[in-house]
């Protein structure tokens, strides 16, 4: 019965909810906006939402509407359409240190040992929690605008490479990369 469609090609709402339940969403920011019209001001709301499966897929979306719940719904739908996959080391942290920027906002992300936790501020924390990262140290420099911070974080995560993709690009074995990582700089210079 699961996955059946009713007349008209619509899925049953229960099945749709089961499919959507794999995602965790976090509301990052709500902004009240005003449009000046002839009769006065018309108020609306803008929402920024981050959504992820806590297994390496994450996306963010922006939605605007006259009511808060509608703006959040639109932002969530937008985030689902913009999911990206990020490779994680041991399913808990980043493979290497990275930096990202958007506008005047810069973020620096560092891989951390097990047990460190998420050391990051506001919007970046929401991205890491929905992504499934458990150990990371992050620093934001410059603009503290939530939109810029989220976009800068996604810019940094876009440049995240797994050892497998690096080894394929450089035509070397993954074990060679791993030995250089564990051994440190002294052994890498000796080779």
Curated annotation (Swiss-Prot):
PROSITE patterns under this entry?
RIBOSOMAL_S5, S5_DSRBD
Q: What does the entry list under GO cellular component?
A: small ribosomal subunit
InterPro entries referenced in this protein's UniProt entry, alphabetically: Ribosomal_Su5_D2-typ_SF, Ribosomal_uS5, Ribosomal_uS5_bac-type, Ribosomal_uS5_C, Ribosomal_uS5_N, Ribosomal_uS5_N_CS, Ribsml_uS5_D2-typ_fold_subgr
The answer to whether keyword RNA-binding applies is yes
Region entry Disordered: which residue ranges? 1-20
The alphabetical list of record keywords is:
Ribonucleoprotein, Ribosomal protein, RNA-binding, rRNA-binding
The molecular function terms in GO held by this entry are:
rRNA binding; structural constituent of ribosome
Superkingdom of the source species: Bacteria
Per the UniProt entry, what are the Gene Ontology biological process annotations, in alphabetical order?
translation
Instruction: Please state every residue range assigned to the domain named S5 DRBM.
Output: 23-86
Its annotated function is as follows: With S4 and S12 plays an important role in translational accuracy.
Q: What is known of its domains?
A: The N-terminal domain interacts with the head of the 30S subunit; the C-terminal domain interacts with the body and contacts protein S4. The interaction surface between S4 and S5 is involved in control of translational fidelity.
The family line of this record is: Belongs to the universal ribosomal protein uS5 family.
Assembly, in brief, is: Part of the 30S ribosomal subunit. Contacts proteins S4 and S8.
Q: What's the name of the protein?
A: Small ribosomal subunit protein uS5
Native species of this protein?
Answer: Nitrobacter winogradskyi (strain ATCC 25391 / DSM 10237 / CIP 104748 / NCIMB 11846 / Nb-255)
